[in-house]
């Protein structure tokens, strides 16, 4: 399991701003992945979080290219591309320079978001990427003092434990909820101890960059800060370079907490836990729960995708069936219309029975012979002396009727 050490565990004094560092060295960008247990139900009350620095780069193009490869290799974690010496919100894809997701559609959306973010940054250059610390007003101070007196009273009477007291300082929740949260936290801590022998904290293959230092800004130690922030202070090839950089930073920023770490390993951070082994156990358990959660999400996603595919296939079959029915209906209507047209054409033929009687002494036999001719001689030749009012389309319609009778 990974090891990490803190160069400074001093609790920071109140800061007015958290600003960017001046440019340093030839490494300008780096890739980082986060583990945020609060995003998983089982571990959201564990006071632990983790990060892994993958590598450092000279240019953004090289960093983005490597981030794509890292994302393919470590499919369970998003890979962020950020700039050395700048302040960023913890595990916040909307506040980073670039991020690689597993899904290509999300990557396309990220590019669109980045374009709009760049436009906003151009309009807000006066802020210089600083996180302003909000000064609490008198009313807020009075309310916080009342809450503290209530916590002290409950603790002095033994109504809440020390862990619940410390938790109430961080979480703005009623006492009964704090007790429930404390129970969940204790269960998670016990599970973490049981899982200590199984290592879920993977390590990257070695790269040229070996060590680094980082500052993590917590709302617990910086009054008025509303979110976790971090700033990578340097990446180095040797331990000597690292120590030299940390010493210089302490002289310039005496109130900053500066942590050292090894590149390519998961590093734990906690506001309340000073024991590195305990922190690693909690981070290890959090990683297991996170990986289980990712696997479940993928399984549910595949189920939803299969169900959606089946629904689409069924809908396609229904549409195809309806189309066939519509075509048959159209054919029936066309045939019916043709028959009606033929009947109309036949009814418009003039009566020539008197002419036939004067030229033929046996009309009955002629009629009989005509029927026989229909049955045995194929297509009937229409008489040349037929009324010219019957046009070619009428002749064709009559012929269709005769063919229909014959068949």
Curated annotation (Swiss-Prot):
Compositional bias of kind Low complexity: 344-370
Which residues, by range, are in coiled-coil regions? 96-130, 287-345
Listed Basic and acidic residues bias regions: 302-317
Report the superkingdom from the record: Viruses
Its keywords, alphabetically, are:
Coiled coil
Q: Where in this protein does the record put region Disordered?
A: 302-394
Bias-annotated ranges (Basic residues): 318-331
An example Pfam family from this entry, by short name, is DUF5832
Q: Which InterPro entries match?
A: DUF5832
Q: What is this protein called?
A: Uncharacterized protein R435
Please report the organism this UniProt entry assigns to the protein.
Answer: Acanthamoeba polyphaga mimivirus (APMV)
